[in-house]
C-alpha cells in the first residue's frame, strides 16, 4: 500500500508511523511527504527515511482549488493509495478521486472539541476547561470540513484530577501512537467500507 503523509510541523506522527514500518508492524510504502511549511522540522524524518518530500504553501496559490491540485497531483503521479494527515494544519479541499482515501488523527473524541481552531494545546485546554472526564483521539476520513468526515476508530484516555494540558496531551499522544498505525492496518486489509457516516470492516 502506497502512502503519502501531509505535515505542517514537527512530524511526530510521521516519525511514529515510520518507526512502526521499520519495526515490521506496518507493511506499507511511504512514497511521499508533503509539507505546508517549507521549514517544518518533520521534513528531517522524510530525509532520514529517504522518502521523497516537498513543500506546497497555501500562500502561493490564489484559490483553494489550485492549492488542492498542487497537493494531490504529486499523489496521483506517485500512485498513492491513501493520504495520511499528521499534524497538517492547513485546510485543503479533497478531490473527488480521493474521497475516503485521506485520513487524519485528531487529539480528542470527535464530535467534541474539534473543528476550526481546535489543534494542539488548544484542544486539551478546552477539554480541561469543560470538565470532561475522558478524552482521547479519533482517526477519521477527511472531507472538505474540519474534523468532520466519517470516524474510522477512536481511543479513550482518562482525564485525571488536576491534569495540566501538557499531561493530558502526553496521555492522548501515547494513544495516538497506537491508534494511527492500527487504522493504517485496517486500511491494509482492504475491507474498510464507508456508507454515509458509518464505517465497517
What is each PLM-predicted segment?
Residues 1-201:
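One-carbon transfer enzymes
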Amino acid at each position: 500500500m502506497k502512502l503519502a503523509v501531509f505535515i505542517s510541523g514537527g512530524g511526530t506522527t510521521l516519525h511514529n508511523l515510520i518507526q512502526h514500518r521499520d519495526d515490521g508492524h506496518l507493511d506499507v510504502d511511504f512514497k511521499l511527504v508533503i509539507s505546508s511549511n517549507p521549514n517544518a522540522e518533520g521534513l528531517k524524518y522524510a530525509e532520514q527515511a529517504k522518502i521523497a518530500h516537498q513543500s506546497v504553501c497555501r500562500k502561493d496559490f490564489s484559490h483553494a482549488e489550485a492549492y488542492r491540485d498542487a497537493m494531490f497531483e504529486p499523489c496521483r503521479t506517485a500512485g498513492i493509495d491513501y493520504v495520511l494527515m499528521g499534524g497538517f494544519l492547513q485546510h485543503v479541499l479533497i478531490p473527488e478521486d480521493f474521497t475516503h482515501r485521506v485520513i487524519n488523527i485528531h487529539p480528542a473524541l470527535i464530535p467534541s472539541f474539534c473543528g476550526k481552531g481546535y489543534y494542539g494545546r488548544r484542544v486539551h485546554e478546552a477539554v480541561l476547561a469543560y470538565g470532561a472526564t475522558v478524552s482521547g483521539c479519533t482517526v477519521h476520513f477527511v472531507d472538505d470540513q474540519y474534523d468532520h468526515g466519517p470516524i474510522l476508530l477512536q481511543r479513550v484516555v482518562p482525564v485525571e484530577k488536576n491534569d495540566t494540558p501538557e499531561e493530558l496531551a502526553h496521555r492522548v499522544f501515547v494513544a495516538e501512537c497506537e491508534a494511527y498505525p492500527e487504522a493504517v492496518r485496517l486500511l491494509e486489509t482492504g475491507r474498510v467500507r464507508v456508507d454515509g457516516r458509518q464505517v465497517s470492516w
